[in-house]
């Protein structure tokens, strides 16, 4: 569902941010 997509997007953003640190 839409919430799942948003959750996955949030995970991807957080994961990418973690790599930046």
UniProtKB/Swiss-Prot annotation:
Disulfide bonds: none annotated. Expressed by the skin dorsal glands. Its main location: secreted. GO terms for biological process: defense response to bacterium; symbiont-mediated hemolysis of host erythrocyte. Keywords: Amidation, Amphibian defense peptide, Antibiotic, Antimicrobial, Cytolysis, Hemolysis, Secreted. GO terms for cellular component: extracellular region. It comes from the Eukaryota. InterPro entries: Antimicrobial15. It is found in: Secreted. The keyword Iron-sulfur does not apply. Transmembrane segments: none annotated. Has hemolytic activity against human erythrocytes and antibacterial activity against the Gram-negative bacterium E.coli. Belongs to the frog skin active peptide (FSAP) family. Ocellatin subfamily. This is Ocellatin-3. The lineage of its organism: Eukaryota, Metazoa, Chordata, Craniata, Vertebrata.
